[in-house]
């Protein structure tokens, strides 16, 4: 049975912005190879969640944050430039600036964006606020750069 109409959707996430071009081209090629001759096939390809691509400047800024955490708070701070899935809002900021953009330095917890399971670890509030303030101070006073 062939339905009168059908719709399909997909949420595509990529590691690099340039990967969208390749994927869109591949999907367009598949759409051209229509199996049902009288069918009307349309493709709407939207780039909704850009990836956050690491730069040398963002890596340097992350290392500075790790040093503050280790040297001043005696704690490790996980930071890497490996893709962690999802689509961070930080990626939108990185598309519009040449300054480094880093993420994953927010409050620790679990269940992000869930209706009834999200929580924050209270013990993470003070050190993360300290880190944020110190990063702003160090950038403002030239102790570290953002280029």
What residues fall within each predicted segment?
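Metal-dependent amide/peptide-bond hydrolase catalytic core
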Residues: 1-147
């Amino acid at each position: 049975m062939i339905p009168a109409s059908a719709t399909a959707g997909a949420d595509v996430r990529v590691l690099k912005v340039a990967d969208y071009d390749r994927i869109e081209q591949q999907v367009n090629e598949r759409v051209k190879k229509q199996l049902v001759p009288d069918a009307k096939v349309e493709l709407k390809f939207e780039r909704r969640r850009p990836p956050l691509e690491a730069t040398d400047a963002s890596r340097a800024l992350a290392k500075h944050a790790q040093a503050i955490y280790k040297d001043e708070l005696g704690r490790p701070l996980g930071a890497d430039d490996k893709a962690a899935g999802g689509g961070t809002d930080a990626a939108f900021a990185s598309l519009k600036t040449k300054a480094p953009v880093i993420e994953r330095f927010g409050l620790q917890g679990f269940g992000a964006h869930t209706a009834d399971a999200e929580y924050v670890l209270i013990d993470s509030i003070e050190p993360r606020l300290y880190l944020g303030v110190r990063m702003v101070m160090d950038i403002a006073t030239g102790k570290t750069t953002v280029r």
